[in-house]
Amino acid sequence: MSSHDFTHPVRYTNKNQPGRNSLSRHESGDSSRSTQGHASLPRNTVGPPDPNALSPEGLVSRPLNTGVGPNQQVQEQYNAFSNQNENDRKMMEDPRESAVPNKRAAAAPPWIGYTQTYQGQQKYRNPQKLQQSTIKKRPKPETTSGPKKASKPTSLSEPKKTECSISEDELLSASLAERVQAEVSENEQIENLTEWAQAYKQKQEKSSETKRRSRKTAHREEEQKSKILTVPIGSLSEDQAVKQLKELTKERRRDDALVAEPSAKKKWQQKEVESKKNEGTSFEKVSDQVRLRTMIEDLVLQNENLQPVEWSGSEMALKRDNDRYQRRSQLKTANNRELAKKMMSMERNEVDFLRNARYSKHGNLKVWNQFKSLVKANKLLEEEIINQKCQELHEIKFKTAAKPSLAIEKSTPTYLENMLIVDDQEKVKNIDISYLSKVNPSHHYQWGEAKWKKIEPLLAELKETENEVNCYYENTMGHDVPQTSLKTVDKILWHFEHKYDAITCTVRFCKNKCSEEI
């Protein structure tokens, strides 16, 4: 007993339960030290464990000399505790969980076969193999909600704990219904495919028929052409046969057009009428110069209370054309017959001059001088026309004004004449504008602004064409004039600087001065 001195103060403790696993020994040399924190524990009650005393049933220590020791009490406590745990586990167990295989068994490796559990029952540890061997695979019915739990095989003595909500008959009927539905859907697919194939075949047959027909018609047309050319060998000459063929093709085209569009007949007739007209008479075309002239006359003549209007390009063009033709018809009346004669003579002179210049083979310096003299003559004519229109405007405007004095009547014509002749804007500022204070300035301003909006795009076009005309004459000096198109001729006719300079001066002057006074 030298190695194990039982008189030595020793205490065996466990974290979970006293007297069981994980024994720890606290030794102390003195008895005084041992009794400091554990005064209530008696000495020599528990001894060191004997390794031979351990058994698989539990921890049973060798009885000591002191009689009945606490080891027997510990064993009884352990047995009672384990029984209590087992009872609690059975009470808490859900009967539905018996269908689920044991988690510990599922985690075991698959090569382990039947094993003995603590209850003595035989349990198979591989649930996948069990399902493959015992359960037949069936399609899952759509009515069941959630995955189906695997059933656990039980012994004959133990009653079944599983409660199946769906019977086997219902499963069989559901699987049969699914099979029937699958067969029906397959049949429908087959029918759809057959219908599609039939439609495709019909389409191919139709396309082949149309191709055959088109070939036949082409062959017939060739035959007809050959007949037309071959039949009249004795009676008609070759030229006559070709002529006849052309007429036939014309008629055929016309018939095709009539078939394609029912309204094409009228168009065809209109085209024929127009072609006949153009053959007999020359189409009267009003030049761009007349268009400009009519615009200026409208600017001078109109005396309504105009509001400023924004014109788009297409509307402006339409308005221009309408005004041109209306003005032309007005000039042909009895009152303005002399003025119309002057304008028409101007136009004729210019056209004749340009026609001669285009086809002349002489030096261009002579032509250029002639053109300059003609422009001067036309300027004088234009000034006469504009002055006449300004006087008319003055009479109309100042008759409506409140009590116009003689001074106003005397000053205004000179003012208007000067305004139309002046080119420089600085000279315009020096002109007497005393009459503006006695005329309604808002009316004058509205009139000027509206007219400026109408005439501004036209003036920009005129400036561009003037530059083009100048470049044209500079490039062709000393050379023969080429055969220019009618467009360049029309642009040359626009070469009158006094027109748009006078208009810009008047409108800008009225705009600035009236805005200052307002």
Swiss-Prot record:
Bias kind Basic and acidic residues: ranges: 86-97, 202-211, 269-279
Region feature (Disordered): 1-169, 200-232, 252-280
Signal peptide: none
Start-end of Polar residues biased regions: 13-22, 68-85, 123-134, 142-157
Low complexity bias locations: 113-122
Name of the protein: Uncharacterized protein C04E7.3
Organism from which the protein derives: Caenorhabditis elegans
